[in-house]
Amino acid sequence: MATENPQTWALWLILSEMASDMQEDKKVAKILVLGPPKAGKTTLCTFLADFMEDGDTLKKGEDSGERERKFEFEFTSVYRPTKGVRIQEFETHEFFTEQEQNELGGTRRLEDSEIQLWDVSGDKKYEDCWPAIKENAEGVILVVNPEEHKGSDLQQWFYEFVEKENIDLSCVMVILNEQGAKKTNHEQISGFEILPKLRGVHHVAHHFGSEAMQVKMEVNSFMASVLKMDQRQMGSGVDHGLGYADEQEDDF
């Protein structure tokens, strides 16, 4: 690979080395968080990291809505684009509730294992790094802002990171990320056009400022489907995920 940007070249080398290390460690579930700029990908990853750090219980004296309200800052502050990729790591036992862990019993990495969320920049100038970012990925979360983006804005991300990498649709999730101080985008949500090839994928529309716990539950369910897919690939023969519709369309 050749690139005129030395910073991009250095990032590519680092990511390639990380991907190589992951091949030796089969206990890492790598999930890519993708989408156009200003979709809220970093907000999602930061939000999940906060829950992992603090746990699902409220801090002493914390109002029940405090955690949800503080994420409004992410939408109203100055936009800071991600440079290349940010990686959040979680232990599986930290990510899932006790009930979810029981439901996932028997998967090969329930204990002493990691989930990695790769928060990938929406800037196409990092495209040279995509091969290293893709390597060993097992799931994809596509994020869009329905006020700013269209379904077609996900087309290249879906093609490059899902279709070309043969990611099963049960391991793909689309989040319509409603931004702003309050939830008011019902018209944009209802009018958002889903790509034909993504109609078999689980779509959710959420507003972090008022629906934080629902977002966490949806992402947990998605992560469980990725781990269950891993178990099926090891020969369990159980199908818990979503799939393509009976009639697929050849083109977007």
Curated annotation (Swiss-Prot):
Pfam families according to UniProt: Roc
GO molecular function, one term: GTPase activity
Keywords assigned: Cell projection, Cilium, Cytoplasm, Cytoskeleton, GTP-binding, Nucleotide-binding
Phenotypic effect of disruption: Worms have an extended lifespan phenotype and are defective in dauer formation.
Annotated binding of GTP, by residue: 35-42, 118-125
Tissue expression pattern: Ciliated sensory neurons.
Highest taxon, organism lineage: Eukaryota
Coiled-coil boundaries: none
Any GO BP annotation: dauer larval development
Compartments reported by the entry: Cytoplasm, Cytoskeleton, Cilium axoneme
Predominant location: cytoplasm
GO annotations of cellular component type: axoneme; ciliary base; cilium; endomembrane system; intraciliary transport particle B
InterPro entries in the record: P-loop_NTPase (IPR027417)
Subunit architecture: Component of the IFT complex B composed of at least che-2, che-13, dyf-1, dyf-3, dyf-6, dyf-11, dyf-13, ift-20, ift-74, ift-81, ifta-2, osm-1, osm-5 and osm-6.
Function: Component of the intraflagellar transport (IFT) complex B required for transport of proteins in the motile cilium. May be required for ciliary entrance and transport of specific ciliary cargo proteins such as che-3 which are related to motility. Regulates specific signaling activities in the cilia, such as the daf-2/insulin receptor-like transduction pathway.
Similarity-based family: Belongs to the small GTPase superfamily. Rab family.
Protein name, entry field: Intraflagellar transport associated protein 2
Organism, scientific name: Caenorhabditis elegans
